[in-house]
Curated annotation (Swiss-Prot):
Subcellular location: Cytoplasm
GO term, biological process aspect, one: D-xylose metabolic process
Record keywords: Carbohydrate metabolism, Cytoplasm, Isomerase, Magnesium, Metal-binding, Xylose metabolism
Protein family: Belongs to the xylose isomerase family.
E.C. numbers: 5.3.1.5
Name this protein carries in UniProt: Xylose isomerase
Cofactor(s) required for function per UniProt: Mg(2+)
Organism, scientific name: Photobacterium profundum (strain SS9)
Length: 439
């Protein structure tokens, strides 16, 4: 293993009185809640890209991180060093899972054949690392957005040769994900959108993207991949408008191409807020549509209009997130992947741990609070009472199709219907939720 984290020991749970900044105060992996351990409920993962590929640069300035695996040198040697550092970090942090893009773990090289060869070599390395550490792969994916060839999209590119190049990456990344025991495969369409309608054929691009998704599903079944295929919605950035805008938009897209029973969503908190939604809204929408798959845990800055990918730190926000997840039965193949990165001036090795520890403690405390809400589920009782009329004779006949518009109008007139207003009691329910969060 690398020496980069040599002065950091494995992170332990030390309880709420802990003064050690490199310790968990709330995340006790084996603590039982609602019949499962915290580890089983939360299924934490750390990502390769933000932690080991981003050099700390931004559009206004150069890299700030002094990472040995990001220095100039033989690209494959740097990839091996990066893998050493990554698995050392994952192991010391104590997450059970990790996630990667294909080009996170291996250099692209100068040709498609070189990419395939480099990637295959590094998959061998990751397989060995998993055997040595016991770490598992939550999901893999292909980076079909960073290389300049994808400046006008991958699946939606006007050039079918670019489409074919992206398909080759996806083919290899899916095979690697299956080989490494990955529980999901993610599709994020970072460039699947447009900058201007002046040069865009919307129908053509939707057909292309739909066909790519169909090919992915066909290949999943051909190779016998047992994991879940996930789409990660995002409204914009890097493109002006992306076709996977939000969960509801994704559902409409999947229905159009007959994929609504084949693909679920990987919801990111910051993407939800960029789309004008709350994190809770996107999860509730996904569970109501049968699309809930996995989570990219992070947060945005409400004063900024872009994807800041900060670590989650709001127990209040994430209690409601955990409540929706628990109410829906919890994760199956998904989990909480920290698609989060330290700030550009946070240059020390310890900073990577501080960010994840804070995020893991936040989600653990949110889980605890949400479990209390489930055990004393006042919200569900209020909702059931509010919609009780739909379980009575009139409501049942409307939904079953026993009433047409004409017969329902006749019934209303004959019965002299006079609905009585009832309070939504929002403020009361908000106070109840606060009682659980701040007890």
């Amino acid at each position: 293993m690398t020496e980069f984290f040599k002065n950091i020991n494995k992170i332990q749970f030390e309880g709420t009185d802990a003064i050690n900044p490199l310790a968990f105060r709330h995340y006790d992996a084996e603590r039982m809640i609602l019949g499962k351990s915290m580890k089983e409920h939360l299924r934490f993962a750390a990502c390769y890209w933000h932690n080991f590929c981003w050099p700390g640069s931004d559009v206004f300035g150069a890299a700030t991180f002094d990472r040995p695996w990001l220095q100039s040198g033989n690209a494959m040697e740097m990839a091996h060093m990066k893998a050493d550092a990554a698995f050392d970090f994952f192991s010391k942090l104590g997450v059970p899972y990790y996630c990667f893009h294909d080009t996170d773990i291996a250099p692209e090289g100068t040709s498609l054949k070189e990419y395939v060869n480099n990637f295959a070599q590094m998959v061998d390395v990751l397989e060995q690392k998993q055997d040595e550490t016991g770490l598992k792969l939550l999901w893999g994916t292909a980076n079909a957005f960073s290389n300049p060839r994808y400046m006008s999209g991958a699946g939606t590119n006007p050039d079918p040769k670019v489409f074919a190049y992206a398909a080759t990456q996806i083919f290899n990344a899916m095979g690697a994900t299956q080989r490494l025991g990955g529980e999901n495969y993610v599709l994020w369409g970072g460039r699947e959108g447009y900058e201007t309608l002046l040069n865009t054929d919307l129908r053509q691009e939707r057909e292309q993207l739909g066909r790519l998704m169909q090919m992915v599903v066909e290949h999943k079944h051909k190779i016998g991949f047992k994991g879940t295929i996930l789409i990660e919605p995002k409204p914009q950035e890097p493109t002006k408008h992306q076709y996977d805008y939000d969960t509801a938009t994704v559902y409409g897209f999947l229905k159009q191409f007959g994929l609504e029973n084949e693909i679920k969503v990987n919801i990111e908190a910051n993407h939800a807020t960029l789309a004008g939604h709350s994190f809770q809204h996107e999860i509730a929408t996904a569970t109501s549509l049968g699309l809930f798959g996995s989570i990219d845990a992070n947060r945005g800055d409400p004063q900024l209009g872009w994807d800041t990918d900060q670590f989650p730190n709001s127990v209040e926000e994430n209690t409601l997130v955990m409540y929706e997840i628990l109410k829906a039965g919890g994760f199956t193949t998904g989990g909480f992947n920290f698609d989060s990165h330290v700030r550009r001036p946070s240059i020390d090795a310890e900073d990577l741990f501080y960010g994840h520890i804070g995020g893991m403690d936040t989600m653990a405390l949110a889980l605890e609070r949400a479990a209390n809400m489930i055990e004393n589920d006042v919200l569900s009782k209020n909702i059931a009472q509010r919609y009780a009329g739909w379980n009575e004779d009139l409501g049942k006949k409307i939904l079953s199709g026993d009433h047409s518009l004409e017969t329902l109008a006749k019934f209303a007139l004959d019965s002299n219907i006079a609905p009585v207003k009832e309070s939504g009691r929002q403020e009361h329910l908000e106070n109840i939720v606060n009682g659980f969060i701040y007890k």
